[in-house]
């Protein structure tokens, strides 16, 4: 009875509903996939590809308007890779770091800006793909594979000597570090994105007339920071794996 009265009183109550742990499952053989994650991810990827195409289809020697903005983004992402990986080794890793940053930023902003709850699904709800732990773990494992590849490609099997440096006593700690890196990356991103959506939903429920725009704006800022942290740490791990090979 109380909930019904609250829903009638709050015109935005549909936006404050939160379903945690419910998913739209797609079955492929014996596999069960979280369909809502794929739907929003595909939309984000399509939006990024469209923006990239529009910004680069008519390149000018003197950039104007949209091209100028795209070049600013590219220089910003190049600086992240250069500062963390090193001036001599960063270029091959710019596409990976840029893809991480833009995809995470797009997913976070899609969850913060688009009222997905107005779209009803048979089960679960559309939301930012990064509020699904499977997405953040997958991104973190990609970074783990990337820095293992970076270290092995530069040092060969000598890369594994780092586990017993400066003393073999640190072997268990160095091995544990390889597990804690993806764990910290994935849970930090997942926790912050999920917490932001929950806070916005609670404020929307408590404030019956106005959607809490200041909280949403703060969420956009926090989402951008999380994308920056994830991509910067990924670049730092790659640079650490190649340490000692940045100088010629």
Curated annotation (Swiss-Prot):
Which is an annotated GO molecular function term of this record? proton-transporting ATP synthase activity, rotational mechanism
Which Gene3D superfamilies does this entry report, sorted A to Z?
A: ATP synthase, F0 complex, subunit A
TM ranges are: 35-55, 94-114, 133-153, 202-222, 224-244
- In the UniProt record, the signal sequence range is none
Compartments annotated for it: namely: Plastid, Chloroplast thylakoid membrane
Topology versus the membrane, per the UniProt entry? Answer: Multi-pass membrane protein
Q: What is its main location?
A: plastid
InterPro entries the record matches: ATP_syn_F0_a_bact/chloroplast, ATP_synth_F0_asu, ATP_synth_F0_asu_AS, F0_ATP_A_sf
The GO cellular component terms are: chloroplast thylakoid membrane; plasma membrane; proton-transporting ATP synthase complex
Keywords from UniProt, A to Z, are: ATP synthesis, CF(0), Chloroplast, Hydrogen ion transport, Ion transport, Membrane, Plastid, Thylakoid, Transmembrane, Transmembrane helix, Transport
User: What is stated as this protein's family in its record?
Assistant: Belongs to the ATPase A chain family.
Q: Which PANTHER family match?
A: ATP SYNTHASE SUBUNIT A, CHLOROPLASTIC
Q: What's its job?
A: Key component of the proton channel; it plays a direct role in the translocation of protons across the membrane.
Q: How does it assemble?
A: F-type ATPases have 2 components, CF(1) - the catalytic core - and CF(0) - the membrane proton channel. CF(1) has five subunits: alpha(3), beta(3), gamma(1), delta(1), epsilon(1). CF(0) has four main subunits: a, b, b' and c.
> What name does this protein carry?
ATP synthase subunit a, chloroplastic
Q: Which organism is it from?
A: Porphyra purpurea (Red seaweed)
Gene responsible for this protein:
atpI
């Amino acid at each position: 009875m109380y909930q019904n009265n609250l829903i009638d009183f709050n015109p935005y109550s549909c936006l404050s509903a939160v379903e945690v742990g419910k998913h739209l499952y797609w079955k492929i053989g014996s596999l069960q996939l979280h369909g809502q994650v794929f739907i929003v991810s595909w939309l984000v990827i399509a939006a990024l590809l469209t923006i990239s195409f529009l910004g680069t289809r008519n390149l000018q020697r003197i950039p104007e308007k949209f091209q100028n903005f795209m070049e600013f983004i590219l220089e910003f992402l190049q600086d992240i890779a250069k500062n963390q990986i090193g001036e001599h080794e960063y270029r091959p890793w710019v596409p990976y770091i840029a893809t991480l940053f833009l995809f995470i930023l797009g997913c976070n902003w899609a969850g913060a800006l688009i009222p997905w709850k107005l779209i009803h699904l048979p089960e679960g709800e559309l939301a930012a793909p990064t509020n699904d732990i499977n997405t953040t773990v997958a991104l973190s494992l990609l970074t783990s594979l990337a820095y293992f590849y970076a270290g092995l490609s530069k040092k060969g099997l000598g890369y594994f000597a780092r586990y017993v440096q400066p003393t073999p006593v640190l072997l268990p700690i160095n091995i544990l570090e390889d597990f804690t890196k993806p764990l910290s990356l994935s849970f930090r991103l997942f926790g912050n994105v999920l917490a932001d959506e929950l806070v916005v939903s609670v404020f929307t429920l408590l404030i019956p007339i106005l959607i809490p725009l200041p909280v949403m704006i703060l969420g956009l800022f926090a989402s951008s920071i999380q994308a920056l942290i994830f991509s910067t740490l990924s670049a730092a791990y790659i640079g650490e794996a190649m340490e000692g090979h940045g100088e010629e």
